[in-house]
UniProtKB/Swiss-Prot annotation:
Belongs to the PEPCase type 1 family. It is an enzyme of class 4 (lyase). This is Phosphoenolpyruvate carboxylase. Forms oxaloacetate, a four-carbon dicarboxylic acid source for the tricarboxylic acid cycle. GO terms for molecular function: magnesium ion binding; phosphoenolpyruvate carboxylase activity. One of its GO terms (biological process) is oxaloacetate metabolic process. The lineage of its organism: Bacteria, Bacillati, Actinomycetota, Actinomycetes, Mycobacteriales. The keyword Lyase applies. Disulfide bonds: none annotated. Keywords: Carbon dioxide fixation, Lyase, Magnesium. The gene is ppc. InterPro entries: PEP_COase, PEP_COase_bac/pln-type, PEP_COase_Lys_AS, PEPCASE_His_AS, Pyrv/PenolPyrv_kinase-like_dom. SUPFAM superfamilies: Phosphoenolpyruvate/pyruvate domain (SSF51621).
Length: 923
């Protein structure tokens, strides 16, 4: 008997290599056929030379020398070629990941840590008390919030083509018949040709209406099916484990969106845009419900001669088709027709465009809300089960019921957001117009709070119908009133939160409350009763100082009686948002991460003392410099008590497509969010025990050292901003047309006023990745000070503490994508040689220092030693990154030397697109 053959790593990756070779060959054939042999030969020579550079057979300048002075007419197809090479390689890697996952499942291996199956095993082993579980999950919510942060560089057209090629490659993988495989390969060739003939970059900036449509598209692709299915699965699994506890009365996964409601720095968000965003979202839900009713009627053809129905279904059936002979003995079809008529009338009432799936009948009664609609579906479910036909109820009908329970008529909660500075200006104007106070802005904080609290107690509006306001104030009031219209139409879940960015004080929170009152969303409760608000007032703490003061700000707000009453009316729930991007830009990677952790510890303590239920909203970006990294690990890295069954987090830019464009990926990512939330809530994942306080004090010291090191470069080195502008393509980021929002909050040369996305994206393009690591090495080295005992303490924390381990793991991921030899080429673009040598010297020294300290603490000589698949992926991308970076430097040099032709500018934008694709993140 022969021993079973053990699969080697070479065996495991062979299908990936074969796919990349096949797709690269198809692209190469396409380029040769349509661009000519000379262009193709140059691309091949550059590609081969890049591989030789990776193998260290030639120096780093080899590719740069080949591209120096290349004609722009040749440079453009070369850039496009490498951009498409890496796009197709990404596609092949995604297929390989699914392929390997299927192999592991088939082999009966233990479930992955971030899966619900693994979480259930951990919960089972913990023998948890049902009452404790019920209390901790009483307000359970996991809410991914899609935002329009402009970091997705791919056009939707390119994304769609990539999706089609992926589907064809999967079919090719399954095909066993040679003729079928050949036919599929022909179709792939056609798709690659179409892709090659498609423009990679947008000619015009995205409008906010486009962003709304893009965000909603993910519901049609995956979310509408996947989210309700996971909700049902999790509820069933938890109730089976704790049958005595009525767990998850509401669906745990409830998605949100900022697109159309986030006006912080985006002048294009108006009252009409708010209404448009909500109506378009509702249209997605209602159209899908109507289509599902049509399909459901096809399957529920049960005859009254064979199956009895409940009186409620008989009543619905009697109200069905006007002609009693139509489906006369098919009560479920008649009942579903009646439901469809009522839902059609609902769509006609709330949407601004006709719905193809609707069926109009005179005098049809719209549903008052989704609960009425769900009651009718529940009646059909109950009738089927009563007659022993529950199997039929468990298919499409169950899926539809779960969807309605999750999405209602609103589909997603639309968050509103505005900067506290704008609130202050608008409130000052309203108070002056109403004669309440002529100069609110001159008042000290305590006087502001007293005045605002008094205004929140009165029913008297500040504005009459003939009020004359500035354009800004009129727009802000109009937007809040539009939100009230949305709530009146679709229910309070349609606009659940109002976020105050750059929140620094209690008055910032009360100013937002006053605007909500003026818009009709906050009821003062006077003269009797307590105030209430349909919208959660959510302070967003963003800078390191504001994060440090956030708990004190919240505690002070809760001491204001009227605000405390608003929180009480919301079930004692208070949401707080934490900003990852600006805190990082403000204080650097390590200091920002610790400021966020410390803020959470302090907020949890305020919640404990004041008796509120704290819910945290994490404003994470796609890159490590903006809070990115694996969501599951990030959730487990939260302090004890910070999750407590509820979590919201932003999903931005290119991350949305990576996570939610394909059903399998969407299911895995949403599972991981719930898995992390359940584990962080129900298990002791911090792992520090009695060592927690000493560890926190140690991190206080490290964070202070890291912030000082970061500040010495970014905030204190004269000429740093000029170095940044000359050594990166930050000036060109705004020309990528990847979002509706301006790149800066205001015209400025200040780092603090630059938005986080161009800040991170520019360093990423230049392969420095500075926001994801700078200052960490200096802090670690100075704190250790050559003391082996101190180094051992850090190693112990790395092994035991998820927070510290995640910080170093994410740092390793971003440093693995950095390349200081390439960065040196960008530094050569700086005119001032002394400035260049000084700042790049500081960057290079800190980079080396950080690598040394990471290796010393983790025991890994190489970055990503504990994540070989990611390390291999980054290594394999080198031959695509090298030409794109070298070409970008070449074109930036031409542009800054006076060649401002449209072709040169287009070439730079193409390289930016290609590099973002190759690095699998942008901003």
């Amino acid at each position: 008997m022969t021993e079973p053959r053990i699969e080697t790593e070479q065996d495991a990756t062979r299908p990936l290599r074969d796919d990349i070779r096949f797709l690269g060959g198809v692209l190469g054939d396409t380029i040769r056929d349509h661009e000519g042999p000379e262009v193709f030969d140059l691309i091949e020579r550059v590609r081969i030379e890049a591989f030789r550079v990776r193998r260290e057979e030639v120096g780093r300048s080899a590719v740069a020398e080949m591209l120096r002075g290349v004609d722009i007419a040749v440079a453009l197809p070369l850039i496009r070629a490498f951009s498409y090479f890496v796009l197709l390689a990404n596609l092949a890697e995604d297929i390989q990941r699914d392929r390997r996952r299927a192999v592991h499942v088939a082999a009966g291996e233990p479930p992955q840590d971030s899966s619900l199956a693994a979480t259930y095993r951990k919960l089972d082993a913990a023998a948890l008390d049902a009452a404790a579980v019920a209390d901790l999950l009483s307000d359970a919510l996991v809410s991914p919030v899609i935002t329009a942060h402009p970091t997705e560089t791919r056009r939707r057209t390119v994304f769609d083509a990539q999706t089609r090629i992926t589907e064809l490659m999967r079919a090719r993988q399954r095909a066993t018949d040679p003729a079928e495989r050949a036919a599929l390969e022909s179709r792939i060739r056609r798709q690659v040709l179409s892709l090659w003939r498609t423009a990679l970059i947008r000619l015009a900036r995205l409008r906010i209406q486009d962003e709304i449509a893009v965000g909603l598209r993910y519901y049609e692709l995956t979310l509408f099916d996947v989210i309700p299915a996971i909700n049902a699965e999790v509820r069933a699994a938890l109730r089976a484990r704790w049958p005595g506890a009525d767990l998850l009365a509401r669906p745990i996964l409830r998605p949100g969106s900022w697109i159309g409601g986030d006006r912080d720095g985006n002048p294009y968000v108006t009252a009409e845009v708010v209404r448009h965003a909500a109506t378009q979202a509702a249209g997605v839900a209602l159209r899908r419900y109507l289509a599902e009713l049509v399909e459901l009627a096809k399957t529920l053809s049960l005859s009254a001669r064979l199956v009895p129905v409940t009186p409620r279904v008989a009543e619905l059936a009697a109200a069905g088709y006007p002609d009693p002979a139509t489906h006369g003995d098919e009560p479920y079809r008649r009942a579903l027709h009646h439901i469809r008529v009522r839902l059609s009338a609902t769509a006609d009432r709330v949407l601004d465009a006709p719905v193809p799936e609707a069926v109009a009948e005179p005098d049809a009664q719209p549903y008052a809300g989704p609960r009425e609609f769900l009651d009718d579906l529940d009646a059909i479910d109950a009738s089927l089960r009563a007659s022993g036909d529950g199997l039929l109820a468990d298919d499409r009908l169950a899926a539809l019921r779960h969807a309605v329970e999750t999405f209602g008529f609103h589909l997603q909660g639309l968050d509103m957001r505005q900067n506290s500075e704008v609130h202050e200006q608008v409130v000052a104007e309203l108070l002056a117009w109403a004669g309440v106070h002529p100069a609110y802005g001159d008042l000290p904080e305590d006087a502001r709070v007293e005045l605002l609290a008094a205004e929140l107690r009165t029913r008297r509006p500040l504005l009459g119908p003939h009020a004359r306001l500035s354009e800004q104030a009129a727009k802000e009031v109009g937007i809040v009133r539009a939100a009230k219209q949305v709530v009146d139409t679709f229910g309070p879940e349609a606009v659940p939160n109002y976020i105050i960015s750059m929140c620094t004080s209690v008055s910032d929170m009360l100013e937002a409350a006053l605007l909500l009152k003026e818009g009709g969303l906050l009821d003062p409760g006077a003269p009797e009763g307590s105030p209430s608000c349909t919208v959660n007032i959510v302070p967003l703490f963003e800078t390191i100082e504001d994060l440090g003061a956030g708990a004190a700000t919240l505690a002070a707000a809760l001491e204001v009686p009227v605000y405390r009453e608003l929180v009480a009316a919301a079930g004692m729930r208070q949401e707080v948002m934490l900003g990852y991007s600006d805190s990082n830009k403000d204080g650097g990677y390590l200091a920002a991460n610790w400021a966020l952790y410390r803020a959470e510890l302090d907020l949890v303590e305020v919640a404990r003392k004041t008796g509120i239920r704290l819910r945290l909203f994490h404003g994470r970006g796609g890159t490590v410099g903006r809070g990115g990294g694996r969501s599951y690990d990030a959730i487990l890295a939260q302090p004890a008590g910070a999750v407590r069954g509820a979590l919201r987090l932003t999903e931005q830019g290119e991350v949305i497509a990576a996570k939610y464009a394909e059903p399998g990926a969407a299911h895995r990512n949403l599972e991981s969010l719930i898995a992390g939330t359940l584990e962080s809530t129900l298990l002791d994942v911090e792992g520090l025990g009695a060592d927690a306080e000493p560890a926190y004090e140690l991190m206080d010291e490290l964070a202070a050292l890291a912030r000082a090191a970061y500040a010495r470069l970014v905030h204190e080195t004269p000429g740093f901003v000029e170095y940044f502008r000359q050594s990166t393509p930050v000036a060109e980021v705004g020309d990528l047309n990847i979002g509706s929002r301006p790149a800066s909050r205001k015209p400025t040369n200040s780092v603090s006023d630059l938005r986080a996305i161009p800040w991170v994206m520019a360093w990423s393009q230049a392969r420095v990745m500075l926001p994801g690591w700078y200052g960490t090495g200096a802090a670690l080295e100075e704190w250790v000070g050559g003391d082996p005992g101190r180094l051992a303490r850090l190693t112990d924390l790395y092994r035991r503490w998820p927070f510290f381990r995640t910080v170093l793991s994410n740092l390793a991921q971003v440093m693995a994508k950095s390349d200081l030899d390439i960065a040196a080429r960008y530094a050569e673009l700086v005119d001032d040689a002394a400035l260049r040598d000084q700042i790049f010297g500081m960057i290079r020294e800190e980079h080396a220092r950080t690598l040394r300290m990471h290796a010393a603490i983790t025991g890994h000589d190489q970055l990503l030693a504990d994540n070989r698949s990611l390390a291999e992926s980054i290594h394999n991308r080198f031959p695509y990154l090298e030409p794109l970076n070298q070409m970008q430097v070449e074109l930036l040099r031409r542009l800054r030397s006076g060649d401002d032709s449209e072709l040169v500018k287009r070439g730079i934008l193409l390289t930016m697109n290609g590099l973002a694709t190759a690095l699998r993140n942008s901003g």
